[in-house]
Amino acid sequence: MTDMPSVTTPALDRYAVFGNPIGHSKSPIIHGQFASLTLQPLSYEAILAPIDGFEASLRAFFQAGGKGANVTVPFKEQAFALCDSLSAEATLAGAVNTLSLLADGTLYGDNTDGLGLVADLLRHLGSLQHKRVLLVGAGGAARGCILPLLKAEVGQLVITNRTQSKAQALVEIFSQVQQGRYSDKLQAMSMPELSGEFDLVINSTSASLAGELPPLPQSIIGNKTACYDMMYGAKPTAFNQWAVQQGAAQVIDGLGMLVGQAAKSFALWRGVEPDTSGVLKLLRDKLQADAQ
């Protein structure tokens, strides 16, 4: 009787998402689906890091063999500070959502939020070229999206915020880092100053989560305007409901951005970009089921 040859299962590369809270995270589901789809040997888990212990938690993960990590609220700025090298998107965002441990042991940081947004917008709209775009909000979510939107060749990008000085500061920071590039396409305006219809209005604020609305003039929405809320839920967000009432041609929520940024992170780590349509449908169906 001959011995059967032993079959060794290849070790799974470890990835994780760090946050606090983290129980709500859909990242393990998304990356698990991506791994199955692309036949990549990896595991992906959610790790609750103590508010005052993110760095220690992250270092322990990498010392135990972790290959890469996603970072969510409230640790994106801390992750930025820990990186040895950064992408242009991360530098401009001042925040990191994707960490990679390089072969030399150093930490590389990227921000794929804006790339995920643009990927979802292109999926819905086909092109952003020459479009007049309004970005509502001047926080971290907005910062991460400016460069990807401009790289997508929008015609004009206007940033508006309740506190106008924050929008203006964001434009100035961007202009300094980019040494004046795109200055002809980027500007800040106060909400009362806004005039004329926009092709695309993006809400980067979390106001919808509280059922609130930024005080935007109705005149910015026309019958060809697409509106995008980075927030999402089982029902249309407060912002998207308002946009429909103003006659917007199309409203889109941020679930596709969530899946899109995850796909960009996955591609950064594994060298293959997964198709997002199946995962997006799975999450959308789950949202609807959980709401019933």
UniProtKB/Swiss-Prot annotation:
Quote the InterPro entries the UniProt record gives. Answer: Aminoacid_DH-like_N_sf, NAD(P)-bd_dom_sf, SDH_C, Shikimate_DH, Shikimate_DH-bd_N, Shikimate_DH_fam, Shikm_DH/Glu-tRNA_Rdtase
Q: What is its EC number?
A: 1.1.1.25
| Binding, shikimate | S25, K26, S27, T72, N97, D113, Y232
Metabolic or biological pathway: Metabolic intermediate biosynthesis; chorismate biosynthesis; chorismate from D-erythrose 4-phosphate and phosphoenolpyruvate: step 4/7
GO biological process per UniProt: amino acid biosynthetic process; aromatic amino acid family biosynthetic process; chorismate biosynthetic process; shikimate metabolic process
User: Active-site residues?
Assistant: K76 (proton acceptor)
Q: Name one GO molecular function term.
A: NADP binding
**Class of this enzyme:** oxidoreductase
What UniProt keywords apply to this chain's record, in alphabetical order?
A: Amino-acid biosynthesis, Aromatic amino acid biosynthesis, NADP, Oxidoreductase
Q: What is catalyzed by this enzyme?
A: shikimate + NADP(+) = 3-dehydroshikimate + NADPH + H(+)
The residues that the entry says bind NADP(+) are G137, A138, G139, G140, A141, N161, R162, T163, Q164, S165, K166, M230, G254
Gene Ontology CC: one annotated term:
cytosol
CDD domains per record: NAD_bind_Shikimate_DH
Q: How does it assemble?
A: Homodimer.
Query: Can you tell me which family this protein belongs to?
Result: Belongs to the shikimate dehydrogenase family.
Main function: Involved in the biosynthesis of the chorismate, which leads to the biosynthesis of aromatic amino acids. Catalyzes the reversible NADPH linked reduction of 3-dehydroshikimate (DHSA) to yield shikimate (SA).
Name of this chain's protein = Shikimate dehydrogenase (NADP(+))
- What is the native source organism of this protein? Shewanella sp. (strain MR-4)
